[in-house]
């Protein structure tokens, strides 16, 4: 039964360990005939995932690079999000995410952007599915570039305060039984594990590349079993302060003990630029 064990093992896709020795890495989302999709290989590795449920409230953004927070959401808003109601996502939901992040961090200003609704077996393509590759959404340079892009003339002033970039992830169907979100203790990520990869859409280089990770035995992974819609995962992608975990990384994984009648996983994640706070 999902959630009855303290850990499980499954596979995730990592960048090959020597990827950083090659030229600038790229991945074409929809390659044309004859084009190379990528100049690196994904490598599957078996990973042990520790269930965070028994110690859910002990994880901290500064120490671990992620945290789990209870935050109520109305069934009506969930249904509007599931129906791809853009106004609901960018209006009511962005406002609730900003309020949550301010409550958790004491931040002065939060900018929400890039919402992704995901569903197992979605027809929306690769970005509508649970993410299968281990990644951190922003490199440091990309996080700063995004601030200038989204905040305009206020960027210089905002960047004088503490600056963080988060991904805020919430299930839309509960509980999550299959393809849960895994997060890694940021203290166990080595610099050599991180590889910037440009995702090419329509032959246009992504100017804000994410980090993809290579596998290391020292990495320690967690997931929250049977995660509910009122349990939100906040995952750090960047931090301007010197703290034990400057970032975490995340990925979905196929749970080995999922019931055959488990509903498809549905979720929403929103990226945030966070200024000020503790």
From Swiss-Prot:
Catalytic reaction(s) noted: asnovolin A + 2-oxoglutarate + 2 O2 = fumigatonoid A + succinate + CO2
Superkingdom of source: Eukaryota
GO MF annotations, alphabetized: oxidoreductase activity
Biological process per Gene Ontology, one example term: novofumigatonin biosynthetic process
Keywords for the protein's UniProt record, in alphabetical order: Oxidoreductase
Keyword Oxidoreductase in record: yes
Catalytic EC class: oxidoreductase
Annotated knockout phenotype: Completely abolishes the production of novofumigatonin, but accumulates asnovolin A.
Pathway: Secondary metabolite biosynthesis; terpenoid biosynthesis
EC number: 1.14.11.-
Family, similarity comment: Belongs to the asaB hydroxylase/desaturase family.
Protein name: Fe(II)/2-oxoglutarate-dependent dioxygenase nvfI
